[in-house]
């Protein structure tokens, strides 16, 4: 089967590689491969830590996506030696004060209610795992199933793997999927999907909006490296960090 994939971020590249590995003829389109949301992502694979109240329909999808990553990493490594930055050290979520610790307990109860594994730790246990944490923390939980990778490294690895799997990568913009020579089209263009036509009738069916965040890159002095091994998340004055 001939498949066209629109969008060369993590989702589009992973889809293209998987389909090519299964014997399909795949072409992927993106004017700037791996330079969109995937380039700016933090790399947390956190279906449990990123749970938000009243978004229950998303939870099975989040869990299934995270569970697929080991298989995807193995598939990528079959086609390339480039690093992915994939790590399975787990995640700690910490609380800055007593109110934040209460919030953490309430969220943990909600996560347990939905079948997610979250372990309450003492602050001493948390600092035993990550000595760089402050002794003034009010609480902590461990989420061993929430992992991490380096998005920029991973997308470059996926591009190399896809090419080695005979995926054709075309650096061009697709405005209308009806112009593509394909038996099936996969639309994986993120926010750009709202500007692609040819797959619906009437008004555009997707009401997409960006989610804003800040990322600060810090250089760790060699004598302190590695400063941390796990992903550290937290609640500080009732704000997620």
Question: Predicted regions span which residues?
Answer:
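N-terminal Rossmann-like FAD-binding beta1-loop-alpha1 element of flavoenzymes
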Residues: 2-27
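Conserved Rossmann-like nucleotide-cofactor binding loop
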Residues: 11, 34, 192
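Active-site substrate-recognition segment that forms the wall
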Residues: 17-22, 31, 44, 82-87, ...
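Conserved dinucleotide-binding and phosphotransfer motif residues
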Residues: 22-24, 114, 161, 165
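Short loop/edge segments at beta-strand edges and connector loops
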Residues: 30, 122-123, 169-173
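N-terminal glycine-rich anion-binding loops that anchor highly charged ligand groups
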Residues: 36-40
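Dinucleotide-binding Rossmann-like beta1-alpha1 core, especially the glycine-rich loop
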Residues: 44-125, 233
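Helical element adjacent to the flavin cofactor pocket in flavoenzyme catalytic cores
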Residues: 140-177, 182-184, 188, 192-195
